[in-house]
Design a protein with these regions (language model features):
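Anionic-ligand binding patches
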Residues: 2-5, 11-197
Length: 197
């Protein structure tokens, strides 16, 4: 069975990959099999570039016959020219909390009507096979930014992101619905289709 190592220290992310790649012929492992995820400076200017940086950093430590996958993701708001984008986790500055990032976003959109609040969560995966070939897979969940936070579940921008076709935020919809709409899940499923073809 092929080994697929997920370049992250986040156990929940590894579980998401494992669940969606079940029966794919890949054994999904965390970066722990390589001694842990090394520190990397994510200084790329796109989600794909940052995903590639992480994948290459782990590949240097991984067994030569392993497949490596990494992701980078964030929120893109059309009225803000795609921001916060690759800066989603630190939108209000280095070390900013989720609440600070969310409040900065709402402040910047304060004057925007509902029709101008289109947004999406985007995820880009970088997959490196044992030969070193790189492939990228994109997943996006379209929606809009609400005027105020709603719901207590989730994290980050979940309380203000209302996915297309729904009237409740990700934080109100709950994990089971969110996981079906997830930008990461869509990217993983695109990768799985490629691996199985």
């Amino acid at each position: 069975m092929n080994q697929l190592i997920v370049a992250t220290g986040n156990a929940h992310k590894v579980e998401e990959f494992d669940g969606l790649l079940e029966t794919s012929g890949f054994e999904v492992c965390s970066a722990k099999v390589c001694g842990g995820m090394p520190y990397v400076l994510e200084d790329g200017d796109t989600f794909g570039a940052n995903a590639r940086i992480k994948a290459l950093a782990l590949r240097a430590l991984a067994p030569k016959d392993a497949w490596i996958v990494s992701d980078d993701s964030g929120l893109e708001v059309d009225a803000l020219g795609g921001a916060p984008g690759i800066h989603s986790a630190r939108y209000a500055g280095e070390g900013a909390s989720d609440l600070h990032n969310l409040n900065k976003l709402l402040l910047e959109l304060e004057e925007q009507p509902a029709s101008q609040r289109a947004a999406r969560f985007r995820c880009v995966l970088c997959l490196i096979d044992p030969s070193g070939r790189e492939q990228f897979f994109d997943g996006a969940c379209e929606g809009r930014i609400a005027k105020a936070p709603e719901g207590a579940a989730g994290f980050g921008y979940d309380p203000v992101f209302v996915p297309e076709g729904h009237s409740e935020s990700f934080a109100e919809l709950g994990e089971s619905i969110k996981s079906k709409l997830s930008h990461r899940a869509l990217a993983i499923l695109a990768m799985r289709r490629c691996l199985e073809s």
